[in-house]
Amino acid sequence: TFSMLLLVMSNNFLQLFIGWEMVGLVSYLLIGFWYTRESAITANLKAFIVNRVGDFGFLLGIAAVLYFAGTLNYGQVFAQAPLLAQKHLWLTGHFAVAAPTLISILLFAGAMGKSAQIPLHSWLPDSMEGPTPISALIHAATMVTAGIFMVARMSPLFSLSVPAMTLVLFIGATGAFFMGLIGIVQNDIKRVIAYSTLSQLGYMTAALGAGAYAGGMFHLVTHAFFKSLLFLGAGSVIIAMHHEQDMRKMGGLARYMPVTYVTFLIGAFALSGFPGFAGYFSKDAIIDAIRVSTTPGATYAYWAVLLGVLVTTIYTFRMIFLTFHGKPRMDAHTREHLKESPWVITLPLVLLAIPSLVLGGLGLSALDYGHFFGASIVNRVGDNPLLQGAGEFHGTWQFFLHGFTTPAFFLVLSGIAITWVCYILRPDWPRVLRKWFYPVVYVLEHKYFFDDLYFRGFSMGARRLGNLLWRFGDGGLIDGVMVNGSARCVRVGSSVLRRLQSGYLYHYAFAMVIGIAVIVGWLVWR
């Protein structure tokens, strides 16, 4: 809490960086809470190392701010923003990068690490190794939100750079769709929710890239509640299942855990963006803002986030049907002891279900189409897609009714229907579909091979390079030539000189005669 408050309330880049690093450190420690588990230690180390890559870019961005603006104070930097647009960094004699573009891209590298954007996203699913309440905290209110907040806070700089905004939009929209696809093939209930976080972070990032900063922040707020609800609901299920997390070994839990089921269902509808729930108001505003955005690549981003609605609904209700519906698939002992979790677990679910229902409608006017953020968020003149959509906004009630006519609503219905048919009506179909689309499933199950690339390409590659350098550099050059080579030269030279010291007097007399002859000859010749 202290770290996030420091990050949010800072008024200069130095304080921001301190809070930024403290959030990363605390998250690293929380992920490794079960320090006796090798998987937990590997996960927190992975999170720490991946974020170091992003934080290196973030630190370079802060250095660029100091170089171009001469200060780290927000107010002074933002006041100089129009002047920064006229400054450039010449990389070659013919190629220069505008200062706002360089600063924004470097700062966004940090956001890619903290907010788990492609390609620095791979640490987030592994953070599930921590306790479930820790997962809820990291995915809802701390680590992953830091990058989204930072980009929105730096909107005066990002808005000056079309290339940076295009990059942010492309990365976000790609993550919103393709990270959601991985969630469809996951069987661990917590990992499904983890990949939903990656997808929803993609929506927030895409909103920032489209210039809808308030929309991204609004979705961050609503997402915090229903994502915490889903994680804690998953924790309730895991406790009832005696710490089993494989959804294939669940089923039929709705009759045993009614409170968990109803609250989990509310979170599922909010995540899917069903009209009336909190997620609908924030997500549909983002989709609409991207539709009218002038950022290059907005057409691709619009279709990516729109199809992401279908993907989100499929993995969400696949989780619902596998966990709470159908025939019980757990062992007899677990089934005999199934019961609702105690009130200390269900009460937080009920409390989180309330904002997951009503927060979107209550906050839409102020957060999305109002002036809640004031001067904290800056757009290019005439380039705020939320304001363009505000002309069609006639109040929360009309926005709610409009939701039943949008393409996103029909995609939600289609996703629910698809999962109901595949997992309730015809539960044998998923196995058939898996065989038909096995190449696609194989790629998704291997998470687009990012982990393989990082482990075999970078980690193992670095080790092989290190071994090569050690063998030829340290062993061959330093030890072989410089250290042992010097000793070898001394040994060879001393052995030659040793033969000259024979101990016979006539050898020395002969050497003296030869020496005198050489000297006399040289004097005569000269």
Task: Give residue spans per PLM region.
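Hydrophobic transmembrane alpha-helices and their helix-loop junctions in integral membrane proteins
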Residues: 1-19, 24-341, 355, 361
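Alpha-helical transmembrane spans of integral membrane proteins, capturing the lipid-embedded, hydrophobic core
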Residues: 21, 52, 56, 224, ...
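Membrane-embedded and interfacial regions of multi-pass energy-transducing membrane proteins
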Residues: 52, 68-72, 77, 172-175, ...
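Membrane-water interface at loop-to-transmembrane-helix junctions
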Residues: 124, 339-347, 399, 404
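Select subsegments of transmembrane alpha-helices in polytopic membrane proteins
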Residues: 136-143, 342-352, 505-511
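Alpha-helical transmembrane segments
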Residues: 180-182, 319, 415-424, 519-523
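Long, highly hydrophobic alpha-helical transmembrane signal-anchor segments
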Residues: 185, 199-209, 280-290, 381-414
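Aromatic-capped, Gly/Pro-kinked transmembrane alpha-helices
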Residues: 365-410, 421-526
